[in-house]
């Protein structure tokens, strides 16, 4: 299937995004209120989209697909910034088994499949491999496991993958596990907070990567 023209692709993404938030996903996990609890709300998706556009992101890594709400917001941003070179790496080991590929189907329905790479592995393995391969991204969005050690590992590898001056955005900033993991990188590696609203938090990486001395450590 040939890629859609740029204007038609952007309109399709916006239509699929609007339908997802108006009517819900085609399929849901069997838990009451699951979509509303798990999916990135539309307003926060707009914030994510606008952040990526403002930073000119053309290549984005996403950890956690679920129902696809954040992926569609990222896809909309890439329609604006990326042109034919846009690339979206989506990592989610549970997309097929837990979500019956509903998020993947939303990306396909939006006409974004040709610029999206799906990785069905845990992020600690997938991100490590991408780093080993020398992959580089302009930005990342993190909404996978919220266990502290897993958020920390995601950020550890994304520090190597996102270019200097790039952007890392995380969902559920109010979770203590997420906030604590981010605080380490703020204090020890010079990440700078970017003002956002809602439930997201965003960090800009230093223009010159900071590598602390072997003995330097700031408690977090």
Where do the protein language model's features map onto the residues?
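S-adenosylmethionine/decaboxylated-SAM
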Residues: 32-220
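Rossmann-like AdoMet
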Residues: 1-40
């Amino acid at each position: 299937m040939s890629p859609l023209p740029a204007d038609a692709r952007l309109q399709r993404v916006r239509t699929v995004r609007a339908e997802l938030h108006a009517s819900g996903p085609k399929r849901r996990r069997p838990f009451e209120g699951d979509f509303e609890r798990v999916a990135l709300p539309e307003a926060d998706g707009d914030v994510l989209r606008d952040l990526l556009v403002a930073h000119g992101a053309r290549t984005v890594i996403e950890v956690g697909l679920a129902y696809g709400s954040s992926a569609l917001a990222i896809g909309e941003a890439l329609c604006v910034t990326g042109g034919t070179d846009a690339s979206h790496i989506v990592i989610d080991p549970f997309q097929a088994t837990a979500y019956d590929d509903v998020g993947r189907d939303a990306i396909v329905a939006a006409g974004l499949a040709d610029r999206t790479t799906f990785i069905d592995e845990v992020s600690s393995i997938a991100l490590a491999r991408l780093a080993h391969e020398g992959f580089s991204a302009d930005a990342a969005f993190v909404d996978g496991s919220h266990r502290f050690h897993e958020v920390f590992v995601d950020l550890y590898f994304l520090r190597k993958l996102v270019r200097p001056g790039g952007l890392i955005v995380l969902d559920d900033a109010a979770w203590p596990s997420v906030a604590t993991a981010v605080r380490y990188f703020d204090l020890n590696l010079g990440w700078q907070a970017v003002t956002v609203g809602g439930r997201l938090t965003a960090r800009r990486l230093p223009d010159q990567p900071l590598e602390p001395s072997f003995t330097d450590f700031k408690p977090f």
